[in-house]
Amino acid sequence: MGLTGCNDEAFDIDSVNKQTLLIMYPWSGTENSAGLYSDMVNNLNQIENAIKKNKGLKSTRVFVFMSTSATESSLFELTYNSSTFTVEHQMLENYTGTAYTTTEGLTDIIGEVKQKAEALNYALIIGGHGTGWNNISDWTDYPNQAKRKAALKTRSFGGLDNTYAINVSSLAQAIETNGIKMQYILFDACYMSNVETAYELKDATNFLLASPNEIMAKGLPYEDIWSYLNTTTPNYASIISSYYSHYNSTSTPYASLAAIDCRQMDKLAAIMKELNSKYTITTERLAGVQTEDGYTPNLYYDLGNYVDSLKPNASIKDQFATQLKATVKAAQSTAEVYSNINATTITVKDFSGLTISDPSSHPVALRTKKQTKWWKATHEGE
């Protein structure tokens, strides 16, 4: 006796959309400044060149949300024309206003993509400025509005204007509301590889690819890494090593990137809760912890070096080291990283791939770090 499905037609597994990838380039400037727009266009051109080089998209459908001004955006699909060997834009939606910065707007955009291309796997790439875990409202003097010394251009500080900035919590909620979980979220933006962000996104993505430092304005080398991204089984180590190699051989040899397994964040938080219940860091020890930013006071500290500086006993120190290794799947940094904030470089002696703001006395940290999900999960009764 033979077995059949609910109908007599054979199920063609190759007909199933394996992966849907959304690339988001929200506005990174002001009403009068284009911010990183030209860099975003260049990144998209690199991706399209990689698609043409690979003669198609394999089993992935790629959608792009791009803001062309502060209040004008569009959503389109990238398709490969095998007759003309070109990448075409199939326009889906045009948007006016800044709803893309809100939970509701993000929910609609992600929902539209899901409706157009339901898939076995989803992934998200976000390009723009970044300040890390903190919210728009946390800043009384939004970083990019301050005058700075002449400096190399990076993707630092959130939007040039907080009107167009997006909270991590809004992104997480938008993804979860749509009933999906990303295979990975890649932030081509500064300061996004921190425990607070990774914990906030743990129910929205399996992996977080991000830098604990600033990223140069040109962003990631997409032609080099596209084949590692355009797959249901991304090669995170190769993405990171390609990024490192690309910048390490240039006149701006500043790059760091990490792949964080967000499914491990609950276990990491449990160990940190035990550490926090038993140990505190002295001012003298904190002064020696590896910093990852140019803020004054510092906002981001290397997680591994911070825990070492707590001087925990051997048992819990080993537990933490084992869990950190399970959480950070791959990470690499150049010998120095760059800070646009004060136009200087930071020597990297300790690099775990994740930062933490627990010990920070920066006004933004003091104002709201205790409100983060990470803090609440790692501190008893606070």
Language-model regions, residue ranges each:
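Structural motif
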Residues: Y25-W27, A189-C190
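Terminal, contiguous helix-loop blocks that mediate binding/assembly
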Residues: D12-D14, T140, A150-E382
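Short hydrophobic segments within beta-strands
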Residues: L22-M24, G127, P359
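Loop/turn elements at helix/coil->beta-strand transitions in domains of secreted/extracellular proteins
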Residues: K18-T20, G56-V62, A117-A123, G179-Y184, ...
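A domain-level signal for caspase-like cysteine endopeptidase catalytic cores
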Residues: P26-G130
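Extracytoplasmic/secreted cell-surface and envelope-processing proteins
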Residues: T30-Y37, E72-S74, G132-I136, M192-T197, ...
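Bacterial Sec-dependent N-terminal signal peptides
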Residues: M1-I23
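Catalytic-core segments of thiol-dependent peptidases
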Residues: S67-A70, S82-T84, T98-T177, A189-C190, ...
